[in-house]
Amino acid sequence: LHEKPFKGINGSGKHNNWSLGTDTGVNLLGPGKTASENLQFITFLVNAISAVHKHNGLLKAAIMSATNAHRLGANEAPPAIISTFLGTQVSAVLDKLAASKGDDAIRFDAKNVFKMSGISHIPTLLLDNTDRNRTSPFAFTGNRFEFRAVGSSDNCAEAMSVLNAAMAHELAEFKQNVDAKIEAGMKKEKAIYEVLKQMIKACKAIRFDGNGYSDEWKAEARKRGLDCETSTPLIFDRYLDKQTLRMFGDTGVFSKVELEARTEVKWETYTKKIQIEGRVLGDLAMNHIVPIASKYEALLLDKVYKMSQIPGLNASADIELIKKIQYHTAEIQR
């Protein structure tokens, strides 16, 4: 299971379908039919997006490896910049919510109206109202997110552990912020929406519905402050960032010592994989490619010599081919 064994051939990876559910089977990322169900949906959706925004570099570190580095950014795989895709309708809901003021009514169509104070209606978000942007590494597909950047040789547990821990930490902070507003005298529903509005604005940089392969997006991602690092060893450093240490420490998932140990293993594994592949390539070149090329070169030389014995024959094409073979074999042997 190699993510990208040969240039020009499609690589291999995994799509991790991720959602959250209650112990009674309720999908927390599934749009509902009532105002309270949709409030729940938006709350968990926004918290998920915010978690990805804060830890986009760490999520990339969780799926990066020596072999996956060759796949990410290629035409058949997500880019090496983590962003979230929500689709047109879901994005419109969040944008209108973020722009609303006080008791403004947010109209989506003639029948569906959502008010900040009354929390009367939020439109049901149907599964087929979200398209499937294949260039997005973290896409919302109706009732779940697809994390599409995990390598074929990687265990899904690492990426899921990071995502779950980041989400748990985000939800804990969300509750603290809501509780603070309630203690200040604000009603619970109003407090929830005020915090959600702040979060939607704060994490808007992670939302991108366009072509993740384009050079324009790479430039735009830098402007947005997203992690655009492409060097695998440097990407692993995200595990030791202060924000990462705090998140894992607060959730009790990993201690600083455990993260340092895991990162050391990642660096060592990366180095060994590069060394192994380098040695294999050297063996293939010196013991298989060069001998065959030399044998073919000898056949061409014999052909050119025999052609020279016959007046009028032109061996220039064969001579040029011999020169190319000689040049490339000499470069390999350097």
Description of each model-found segment:
Residues 5-6, 10-12, 24-25, 40, ...:
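Acidic, glycine-enriched catalytic cores built around paired aspartates
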Residues 1-35, 41-47:
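Helix-rich catalytic cores of soluble enzyme domains
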